Amino acid sequence: MENKSIARSFRLLSQLMELHTENSFKIKTVANAALKIDKLPFSISSKTLEEIEQIEGLGKSTSAKVWELLQTGTMTDLQNILANTPDGIVDMLGIKGIGPKKILIIWKDLGIENIGELYYACNENRLIEAKGFGLKTQEEIKKVIEFKMAAEGKFLFAHSEHLAESLKAELLIWLTAIEPAPLLTIAGAFRRYCEIIEELDFVIGSDVAESVIEQLPAFASLPFEQKTENLFIAMSPFGLKIQVHVYPKSDFAVNLFKLTGNEAHVSSVLSLAGDGPFTDENEIYANAGLAFVTPELREGLNEVELAKTNQLPNLIVYEDLKGSLHNHSTWSDGVHTLEQMAVYCKDTLNLEYLGMCDHSRSAFYANGLNEQRIYAQHQEIDALNAKLAPFKIFKGIESDILNDGSLDYSDDILKTFDFVVASVHSNLRMDEQKATARLIKAIENPYTTILGHPTGRLLLSRKGYPIDYTKVIDACAANNVVIEINANPLRLDLDWRYHRYALQKGVLLSVNPDAHRMEGFRDMHYGVYIGRKGGLEAKQCLNAFTLTEITDYFNNQKII
């Protein structure tokens, strides 16, 4: 075992001891041992126990730990303390800029136990409420986490979007200098609006393909590391694989189609369309006797059968949205005031209404609203509605679903809201039976309007709790409860793979940004993308209702 590995184990032990507030003298002894071992000019693994005890600065107790590590590959003290520390907390120790003291606050005061939850808390502006944290620290932590996530080789769609579009623009300018009318499209999972991206595929069609292939290594924005006959591969500065494919224009359409995927869809369509050549993708589908299938639906499900009978859905577009539901303000853990959020929706986004759903009282970590503050917020909403009319703010709440499935307030409080988003935020470690029962009880509450982020997942960070999707969706259908598509790029929950079943059962979906600041409303674009992927039409989307329609909907939902 190398000195650095031994030192790393001692360093981890000292950090964990500090995290668990053990004796400061013992912590310092272990930390100093890590420094000492790391700087030794010889390999400590070649020494006997007696020789290790003679090393200045170690002593018998530390030497015994070193010897145990060399003989067994571990230390009892380290294993014992690891057993009492969540894995996610240990992972946090690797984040530059936060040490054990801050992690202890994150863990014990905020109830955050892994990096994914920490990243989400940064996005919700929750860290600045904790002792010793400011806005600058929060932003620095967020950037470090984003870098760490990137190192895994998988990226959120939203995190790859800017790079994809900027590279496309630069590449098009570069290509136009070679020929006047090049063809250029992004293919692959990005074109299909997949929530997770592992590579970006650019497909070029050119009348002078050989010349493009010859000159492409000089394209300054991409330092290519590999090249085959017509494929160039590079890595972005943050680790996203980028592939550029070059074809003659005559081969562009079929290769764009193949590289867009998915494999099952491509195979099904080409078995009907034949070998081509094809001038564009429309011709591929026409030759196959199919209606054109938009890229986001190409997942090898039932889209080919629907295309045969011209029964593909008329997919929702962003412009169909008339309002934004499930948002937060400074009343709980938002960055902007209620009025700022409303004016932004009205004047910048040209929406007709805003649903304000600050956190409920159990969400103490998010400054959740008690009964008195609910009354005060409703007074402010009444005043703003008079000021901003005909724009309307609906009185909502994101009510925690408690461990037994009940909501966070009495019926007397719940009936004061125009609508209620019911969400799970605590006790996430559940098996499928417990999670499903908990959700269904909340769904059956007559005051529940929308089921918020149904699985609690954080993409690339935290798996959602397991649920029986069929039972949960059936319960929503039976109780006339809307299911949220949480549009935050970290969530995109309800998963698009279950949209079709929900829509078949007559369940409305709602594209909700869960915005905690004005910029957060932009996430509705991602919700629309994922809704399209699931087959969502505007008529099946709650916040595509006009102000009159949604007012009637909420009024009809109310218990008399």
Describe each PLM feature range.
Residues 1-22:
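Charged, compositionally biased N-terminal leader segments and the immediate start
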Residues 3-7, 133-146, 243-245, 350-356:
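Short, compositionally biased low-complexity segments
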Residues 14, 26-233, 239-240, 249, ...:
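Accessory alpha-helical DNA-binding modules that contact the DNA backbone or grooves
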Residues 113, 182, 351-352, 449:
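Short acidic/polar active-site loop segments enriched in Thr and Asp
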Residues 184, 354-356, 451, 483:
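Hydrophobic residues within beta-strands of alpha/beta enzymes
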Residues 186, 323-327, 398:
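Two-metal-ion RNase H-like nuclease active-site motif
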Residues 193-329, 338-349, 361-391, 403-560:
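Charged catalytic cores and adjacent phosphate/nucleic-acid-binding surfaces used
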